[in-house]
Each structure stands twice: as C-alpha cells, then as structure tokens.
C-alpha cells in the first residue's frame, strides 16, 4: 500500500511538471513564442535550434488570414517561418498580449515573405507598439526577411503590437516573441530601446541564442582583421543582472598592435538618433605579476568613462552609458585605448548598442480600455477597426467612438459611444459605467432586455442616452428621471415592456372593473399577508440557517459603491473574481471594494460563498467584511483596506520598500496560522480555506497579517467519520495538497499542507514552482538541497544572515512537516503555532542580545516591526 501511495504521488508531481512545462514553454516563465499562422488545431512544438516551445497565434489576434511559404523554402528556414499571418482587410491589425505592467520585455518580431502568395511583390508596411510607431518593415530591401527587436516596459497589463497598411501591399508577420528581462537592466531615461546590434567578439560563425542566453537575446559573432581573438576554457562568472552567455565571455578581442586602440565605427540609420552602449568585459588571460590591463572608453573623441576600466579575472563587468549619447552626423566612432600605466592592450568580450525610440502618445485610460474590451467581448462585437488602442492614433479611432484627445502626454478619454443597430442582446452591462467621461451613449435599435440600470444616472458626464428600439422592461429609475429634469436627453421609445409613467400602474379600461377588482384584490392581499406570517413563523421555529443576506453588516446599493470608489477610479489589483478598487467610506474609513466581473471565472457562486463565510466568522487575523452589494447584476464585497498589500509583493520586491526581516516574517506566519486555526476549530461548522498562498495574506499599516479570499472555502465536520468531505478539487498549483488532488477528499490538513508551502516561501523567498530548478516544486527542492548538505542556498539571501540560525531551522522543520505528502503525518495548526512562537522567541532573544552590544547609531536596511502575541494559542474572536 505504501509503495502504491508513492506511485500515485510520483504521478502527481510528474503531472504538475508536464502542466508547468506546457504552460511556460521550455522552462522559461513569461516567454511568449507565437508561430504566426500556425493553425489552432496544431499542437505546440519545440523548435529544434533553441528548444523553445512555439504555439499558434490564433488566440492573440481577431483578424488576418494564414499563409505558408513554398515547400522548397521550408527546409532552409526555421519551422516558425514556414507559416505566416497576412492582413488583407482593414488598415490596422493588432496582437493583444497579456503582460506584466512595469516589467522590462524584449519584444522580437520576424518577417519572411517567401513569395507565399505567388505575386512576387514584397510588402512594405509599418509596425506600431501600442499607439506609437515602432518601425517600417520594407521587405523589398531585405528579401531574405528581417527581425526587429525592442526593449520596452508596458504601461498596462495589455500590450498591442500592430501591423499597419501604408500602401498597396499587404502586411504580414512570421513570428512574434516576448522575453521578460530583469527590471534593473536596459533602463532608458525616456522611451524604449530599439535594437541596433548585439555582438560577441569572436571569429566563430555561430549565432548565440537560448539556452546559451537565458533571456534568448541573439548574439552575432564579429571580428576585425586588425584584432586578435583570445579565449579561455575556464568558466567565467556571468551572474550579473545582464547575464550574457558564458560562451561569449570566454572569448574576447584585443588589437594586434599592442599600443593601438580597439576601434569600432558604425553609421546610424537616423543621424539624430540617441544611443545607449552596453559593454561586457572579463579578463580571460592570467596576467603576470607586473602586468596591468587598464583602458579608457572614447566615443567620437570624448572620454566617457570616469576612471580607467580594469576587467576582473574570470568575472563579468558590464559598463554602460547611463545617459543617451549622440554621434556627430550619425557616424559613431568608439575606441578603447590603454592608459599610461597599462602594459597590456584593451580587451572587449561583448558589445550591445540600442537607439532610443520615443513613445510620445499616451495610450487611452486603462480602466476605459478594459471596459470597452469587456463590452466588445460581452456582446460579441466583431469590427475590423476594434483593435489596438481605442482612441489613438486618431486615424485609427474605433468605429462608433469619439475621444477627448487634448495632449499626447495625457491619456485620451472616451466621450461618445454609438452602438446603434449593432445586434446587441442581453442586459445593459455595468462595464459602461467605467467610461467615466462618456457624454453620449447610443444603444438604440438592438435587442437589449432587462431593466434600465440605475448606474446610468451616476455617470455625471452623460448628456445624451438613446435606448430606443430595444426590449427593455420595468420602470425607469427615479434618479434617471431626476437627471432628465436637469437636462439629460433620454430616449426610450420603442420599448413595449418599459413603464414610462411615474406610478407604473396600468390605466383601467372600465370604471366598473375597478369596483369589482379593488375589493377582491384587497381581500387577496390580506389573505397573502396572513399566509406569509404563518409560514414565516413556522420557518423561524425550524433549526435551519438564516438566509445569507440577513445580516447586521451594511448592505450597500450599487450607487453607494460607485460613490465610495469615485466611479472605480483607483484599481488596487485584479483576480479571478474581478477588479479590487480603493474606496472611501464617508470620508472616515478606507475600504477595498471587490467587484464581481461580468466575465468572472469565479462568479456568483463563489461570491455568495465568501459572503456566507465572512458574515459568520470574526477573527483578528481574517480580513474584516465591512459590507456588500447584491443589486440585480451588481455584486461587490467591501473589506477593510490593507494598506501594505499582500505578502507576495513584499517577498518579491514588487511592493518596494525595505526587506522584511526574519522576525517580521515569523510574525506574519504566526498570524496567518492563527487565522487558519480559527477556521479549523473556532468556526461551527469548521471551515477549510482551500487557497492558502502568499497573495492571500494581506498586511495592514502595522504589517499585521490577515487571511483573505474565501471564495473556495468549504465547511466540514470535525471528528467521527466525516472529518473529510469529497469535493471538486480547487486551489492553486504549487500550494495544492497532493493527497487532496489524488483523492478529492478535503480536510483541514489540506490547509496545513498549503501553509507549509507558504512557510517555505517565507523562509527561502523562492518560487513555489520554478522549472529552472532541478526540482521544480519548492518542497522537493528544499529536500534535495538539504540532502546535498548545501544548506546555505535555502535561506533568503536578502536576509544577509541576519537571523537566529536555530529559529530558521526550527521553522524549516515545521514547514517540511506541514508539507508532508501524507496528511496523517502533518501537524494541526495549534501545534504549528506553538512551534512558530518558539522560533520567534529565539529570534527575539538574539535581537535583544545584539541590541545590548550595538551602538545606538546602528541602522539596518531591513524592515523591523515590533512583535507581540498573546500567550493563549486558542483562536480568539474579535
């Protein structure tokens, strides 16, 4: 039986490996590799040269047709160039890519015409990134194809790459690739960085790409006749932020004439271009005792380094220009010249040059872009012009839209939307209200049904609303009638089921009918009231839970939600439920408003589950529900505002600020454990959270931790034969209990497993799943490292050894016991809390001892938070 269990667990982790491998593509998180024109029904494939997984572009673009180069050319080119996508319809056709806002990306687009259409006319067209022009593609000049690269930081979570028709020929594209880079590399003062060249100095003929370059940059070999190539067989430490290929750093060039400069000259496409230089140096020769290699960097006669450059032996050094440079007349002359004290000539291993691409036009307001895209998706709108940025450039304004474009540096706003006669059906969705500057809305002559939503009255900029010719019903909201009296033009004619009068009671046809119907109706009403009273009394005597909406918690109207969020002005984040917005409650309390998206993957069921749970649980380490909104098709949860975000942001550095020290991390872990303990033993019935992870641990202004996101939580009976319940497996990969995954049997020990993974994340600051490791799962990786005896790799290096060793290793033992594959061998949360408090006591003792020996002026770059806890380990209600 034991062997069978291990077989199942092995299959589980193998399945996890396959899922991650498929999703990330050749072990590279964040890589997007699109083979343009590859049919959607063809599976992803591994490209033989690089080992990178390519897949179809079908899900990233709404338009275009697919083509294929002739068979005789396919064998001569990489597989991803065999197919292509071309765009005979429309002027601008755009890829829409999901990216991480503020992350540095290398974006590569490849174009190979190959006479796929038999016309033998190479196309010429423009390529845009967002609303700005990137470059012109002229395949008449480069018939063998071309590759364009740019390093760019997206301003939102959505990135558009657009192909723009500029003449008679038809735009096309062969491949589109995105590669995330380190955020502290390739920083431009403004704009983005267009690839000019990237070379390693060698007489080799091999183009270097992934996997030799972890970021999949392409390095071209280059050498001049007046240079000597030198090389080494020793490994060079290439681990700086730029991380150039090991192969490139093992080679270098020096001038043949030992007293000469190492000189490179190149001409810019545009004489006015500004450039950034990146040079990678490593000393790969063993120098004699009296030898010195030191040199200056001179660009067009100006020394641009502040002191002599001396490469270190077998270590990388990257020198770069922090400010953009210009070359007179567009001709750049760079020289490395040895200094007077140098006995050896200059040396260069690898070299990169980029030109600055200014992106002056701001993209349309992000909230409005999300809203109009959701409207497009909800109603299934298919318009060739509805691609790329909705408002800019002006010549590509979406059909039916008008925008306020006052200044290219300010985000445009949508002020008019005409969807008349567009075949719309369903209700008027709430996404319209996020168009906060909308002045005119025309939804006439469609098949819209349901009520006229009250949120239209809260859209203060609206001057004209045309809802005529639909199938709307019910009454017109009084607030909208009030706006009408203030000057709003409202047209609702042609909606047969819509009540236009103030009372919404049909006029009687005959007075005699009133005399008969009125008494009968009165008697019927009295009978109904009596029956309802008796029914309610009977129901109240039964031992059943109350309806979930009956609560002392505040129930807000949707208009109140809009008021507290200032019309959804400040998004805090986004999850499976929808967008979370910042709110202000009566000017006295900050709140977080979690709004259910119309296209939410969780939906109303999880919304209801979360409300039901939060209405009956009260604990200082569970996020506090201030109120909720359940109004027609509008659902929202209003929580207390947690000003320091989530734990994952602090561990990853995305939140900024100081590093969380070890004591603070233990504090957070204990508080999260207390919240779980309350769910497991303090609730009746007991609850399992099912989604314990670092993004669901929120931190207030004092870094006190609270557990959030209860949409997946489930109740269970403690003790007896029903201590486990069978459910559909849910949770987050990496944190998910493998035993629960295999059996679908849920218990509180599933949360314990997830907490163990969370604790490992806190200790190591490693990804929970990382395919670049030999053991991708964090628990397996820690076990592997411990067995190797190389324990220095385990603890987060950002702590710089500033912790009590016993405390850390005791916490590690707790984490590993929680993450035991067998649920019966895992501790309960009360035992976990006792052990973690012992860890905290050890750390506090170390701090007290150190404080006695430290000068009062000592400072630390780590964040210190005062830690205090009750000695009672039982859950305490607030």
Swiss-Prot record:
<dbReference type="InterPro" id="IPR001611">
    <property type="entry name" value="Leu-rich_rpt"/>
</dbReference>
<dbReference type="GO" id="GO:0016020">
    <property type="term" value="C:membrane"/>
</dbReference>
<keyword id="KW-1133">Transmembrane helix</keyword>
<feature type="glycosylation site" description="N-linked (GlcNAc...) asparagine">
    <location>
        <position position="183"/>
    </location>
</feature>
<feature type="glycosylation site" description="N-linked (GlcNAc...) asparagine">
    <location>
        <position position="290"/>
    </location>
</feature>
<protein>
    <recommendedName>
        <fullName>Probable LRR receptor-like serine/threonine-protein kinase MEE39</fullName>
        <ecNumber>2.7.11.1</ecNumber>
    </recommendedName>
</protein>
<feature type="transmembrane region" description="Helical">
    <location>
        <begin position="515"/>
        <end position="535"/>
    </location>
</feature>
<feature type="compositionally biased region" description="Polar residues">
    <location>
        <begin position="849"/>
        <end position="869"/>
    </location>
</feature>
<feature type="repeat" description="LRR 2">
    <location>
        <begin position="437"/>
        <end position="458"/>
    </location>
</feature>
<feature type="repeat" description="LRR 3">
    <location>
        <begin position="461"/>
        <end position="483"/>
    </location>
</feature>
<feature type="modified residue" description="Phosphothreonine">
    <location>
        <position position="732"/>
    </location>
</feature>
<feature type="topological domain" description="Cytoplasmic">
    <location>
        <begin position="536"/>
        <end position="878"/>
    </location>
</feature>
<feature type="glycosylation site" description="N-linked (GlcNAc...) asparagine">
    <location>
        <position position="203"/>
    </location>
</feature>
<dbReference type="GO" id="GO:0106310">
    <property type="term" value="F:protein serine kinase activity"/>
</dbReference>
<feature type="modified residue" description="Phosphothreonine">
    <location>
        <position position="727"/>
    </location>
</feature>
<feature type="glycosylation site" description="N-linked (GlcNAc...) asparagine">
    <location>
        <position position="404"/>
    </location>
</feature>
<keyword id="KW-0808">Transferase</keyword>
<feature type="modified residue" description="Phosphotyrosine">
    <location>
        <position position="740"/>
    </location>
</feature>
<dbReference type="GO" id="GO:0004674">
    <property type="term" value="F:protein serine/threonine kinase activity"/>
</dbReference>
<dbReference type="Pfam" id="PF13855">
    <property type="entry name" value="LRR_8"/>
</dbReference>
<dbReference type="Pfam" id="PF12819">
    <property type="entry name" value="Malectin_like"/>
</dbReference>
<dbReference type="InterPro" id="IPR032675">
    <property type="entry name" value="LRR_dom_sf"/>
</dbReference>
<feature type="binding site">
    <location>
        <position position="594"/>
    </location>
    <ligand>
        <name>ATP</name>
    </ligand>
</feature>
<feature type="glycosylation site" description="N-linked (GlcNAc...) asparagine">
    <location>
        <position position="466"/>
    </location>
</feature>
<dbReference type="InterPro" id="IPR024788">
    <property type="entry name" value="Malectin-like_Carb-bd_dom"/>
</dbReference>
<dbReference type="InterPro" id="IPR017441">
    <property type="entry name" value="Protein_kinase_ATP_BS"/>
</dbReference>
<feature type="repeat" description="LRR 1">
    <location>
        <begin position="413"/>
        <end position="436"/>
    </location>
</feature>
<keyword id="KW-0067">ATP-binding</keyword>
<keyword id="KW-0675">Receptor</keyword>
<feature type="glycosylation site" description="N-linked (GlcNAc...) asparagine">
    <location>
        <position position="445"/>
    </location>
</feature>
<dbReference type="InterPro" id="IPR000719">
    <property type="entry name" value="Prot_kinase_dom"/>
</dbReference>
<keyword id="KW-0597">Phosphoprotein</keyword>
<dbReference type="InterPro" id="IPR008271">
    <property type="entry name" value="Ser/Thr_kinase_AS"/>
</dbReference>
<feature type="modified residue" description="Phosphoserine">
    <location>
        <position position="726"/>
    </location>
</feature>
<keyword id="KW-0723">Serine/threonine-protein kinase</keyword>
<keyword id="KW-0812">Transmembrane</keyword>
<feature type="modified residue" description="Phosphotyrosine">
    <location>
        <position position="639"/>
    </location>
</feature>
<comment type="similarity">
    <text>Belongs to the protein kinase superfamily. Ser/Thr protein kinase family.</text>
</comment>
<feature type="binding site">
    <location>
        <begin position="572"/>
        <end position="580"/>
    </location>
    <ligand>
        <name>ATP</name>
    </ligand>
</feature>
<keyword id="KW-0677">Repeat</keyword>
<feature type="topological domain" description="Extracellular">
    <location>
        <begin position="26"/>
        <end position="514"/>
    </location>
</feature>
<keyword id="KW-0433">Leucine-rich repeat</keyword>
